[in-house]
């Protein structure tokens, strides 16, 4: 069992050391200005937050994350900015957005490199670990609870809906036959054994979509995103901007329609901004990133002022 100091080492060094995706596009998209107040709703290790704070003088930033490890890393990364930064531990959907308080809001969705590369968090089948997948470790529901307790139909439904897995019924049947499962590798092996060889040895591991579905369900990710999209625009000042980075089609669809359907927002990106080939070569995580940006409309009666 790792000591507290060993865990801290992994948080501070292994972590959140990955490069922020679409860095210049985010700063430009938010139109960061001197004296502005910005919200990073998914601060992670603080990579994007640092760019925002460095983009103009006297910038203030509120850094939100539901993961205690992330906040530990972000506090170290952003320590030099002192009282310019306020840290809040919260899921971005549960955060109490102050009305008309921010010049820009950023959300970088999905799982970080840290979560995938830290075995004890249980997000990846590349490492043997307990089936966990909780972003907020204060919550009770884990991936093991879903896999071992939900019935076959429920499992098939979530694999299809949230993982877009075509073999969802077949995989769910095998899981129910073989459970209980305790580790990520046990589950991944059962999934691989349930699919035809052409899928088993394909470029994408057959467990990939199932693990995505489990992560989404355990963390209620899509419902949280819907709530965030409803609440966040109210926190922007007129002319303030919201920038959201998504990593898979389910997220991007919600972001696209959420921004478009908000009566208080004007969408600035007809198509999502994606990484350049140079960035992808330098930071492979950016390959699937899509950035959408919208601007808060002026209040009624302010348009001509």
Curated annotation (Swiss-Prot):
GO biological process, one term: rRNA base methylation
Gene Ontology CC: cytoplasm
Substrates-to-products reaction catalysed: cytidine(1402) in 16S rRNA + S-adenosyl-L-methionine = N(4)-methylcytidine(1402) in 16S rRNA + S-adenosyl-L-homocysteine + H(+)
E.C. number: 2.1.1.199
SUPFAM superfamilies in UniProt: Putative methyltransferase TM0872, insert domain, S-adenosyl-L-methionine-dependent methyltransferases
Keyword annotations of the record: Cytoplasm, Methyltransferase, rRNA processing, S-adenosyl-L-methionine, Transferase
Keyword Methyltransferase: yes
Domain of life: Bacteria
Signal peptide extent: none
A GO MF term: rRNA (cytosine-N4-)-methyltransferase activity
Main location, first listed in the record: cytoplasm
One Pfam family cited in the UniProt record for this chain: Methyltransf_5
NCBIfam families, A to Z: 16S rRNA (cytosine(1402)-N(4))-methyltransferase RsmH
Task performed by this protein: Specifically methylates the N4 position of cytidine in position 1402 (C1402) of 16S rRNA.
Recorded family membership: Belongs to the methyltransferase superfamily. RsmH family.
Protein name per UniProt: Ribosomal RNA small subunit methyltransferase H
Species the sequence originates in: Trichormus variabilis (strain ATCC 29413 / PCC 7937)
């Amino acid at each position: 069992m790792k000591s507290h100091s060993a865990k801290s080492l992994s948080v501070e060094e292994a972590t959140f050391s990955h490069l922020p995706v679409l860095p210049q596009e985010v700063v430009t998209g938010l139109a960061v200005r001197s004296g502005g107040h910005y919200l990073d709703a998914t601060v992670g290790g603080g990579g994007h937050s640092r760019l925002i704070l460095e983009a103009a003088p006297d910038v203030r930033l509120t850094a939100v994350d539901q993961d205690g490890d992330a906040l530990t890393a972000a506090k170290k990364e952003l320590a030099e900015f002192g009282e310019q930064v306020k840290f809040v531990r919260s899921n971005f959907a549960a955060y109490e957005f102050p009305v008309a308080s921010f010049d820009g809001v950023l959300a970088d969705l999905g799982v970080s490199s840290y979560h995938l590369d830290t075995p004890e968090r249980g997000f990846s089948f590349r490492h043997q670990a307990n089936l966990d997948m909780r972003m907020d470790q204060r919550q009770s529901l884990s991936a093991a609870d879903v896999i071992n307790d939900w019935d076959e139909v429920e499992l098939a439904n979530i694999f299809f809906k949230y993982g877009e897995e075509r073999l969802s019924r077949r995989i769910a049947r095998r899981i129910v036959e073989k459970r209980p499962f305790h580790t990520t590798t046990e589950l991944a092996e059962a999934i691989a054994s349930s699919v035809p060889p052409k899928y088993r040895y394909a470029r994408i591991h057959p467990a990939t979509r199932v693990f995505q579905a489990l992560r989404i369900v355990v963390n209620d990710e899509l419902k949280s995103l819907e709530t965030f999209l409803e609440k966040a625009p109210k926190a922007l000042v007129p002319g303030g901007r919201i920038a959201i980075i998504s990593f898979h089609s389910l997220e991007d669809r919600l972001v696209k329609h959420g921004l478009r359907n908000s009566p208080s927002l004007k969408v600035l990106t007809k198509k999502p901004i994606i990484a350049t080939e140079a960035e992808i070569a330098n930071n492979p995580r950016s390959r699937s990133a899509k950035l959408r940006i919208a601007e808060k409309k002026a209040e009624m009666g302010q348009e001509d002022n």
